[in-house]
Amino acid sequence: MRHSVIAAVLTVASTTSAALTWSLEKSSSPTTDEAEAYGLIEAALEAAVARHARLGDASKTLYVQYVPGVPTAEASYDGTIRFGTDRSYLNERTALHEISHTLGIGQTQAFDDRCAANDWPTATPLLQSWDGADAIINCGGGHIWPYGLNYNDEWSETNADRHVELINAMLADGL
């Protein structure tokens, strides 16, 4: 009996650790602008985190803020994501893109080293299975393409799924 209880606890702990979790910092008395932004940001994060849960196993605690001075959105490896006032960026595409930065895209030495060497033994074959034998992961300016979801015109359900799958493959490669 003791072993089954320990096994159950370990299963819960490992399931919990392999997930993206997030919290949105909110004003206690939000303005109309803040309330609207909070709703859009929450919807974007809920969709992005659900997609990650369905297609990958990335793990990170995300600290999300609405910061009117931010032109679009920005993120750091420490898990902070900041969205600005431009409503065209308060969407799932932007949330997925910024989450990738919190996971290491454009943020770590491992990313820089693997990009410079084009050393993605798991991610490159995955990309090639979609885009053909000549496909490579391009890196520049702290971003990747294809499937980096760098701009709103890159959005599609297929591209969003591939983004999550590619980021998870890059994590498996040591991102």
Roles of regions detected by a PLM:
Residues 81-96:
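Short pre-active-site segment immediately N-terminal to the catalytic Zn-binding motif
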Residues 15-19:
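Sec/Tat signal peptide C-region and signal peptidase I cleavage site
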Residues 93-106:
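Active-site recognition of the HExxH zinc-binding catalytic motif
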Residues 1-13:
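Fungal secretory targeting signals
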Residues 108-175:
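Metalloprotease/metallohydrolase-associated module, dominated by Zn2+-dependent proteases
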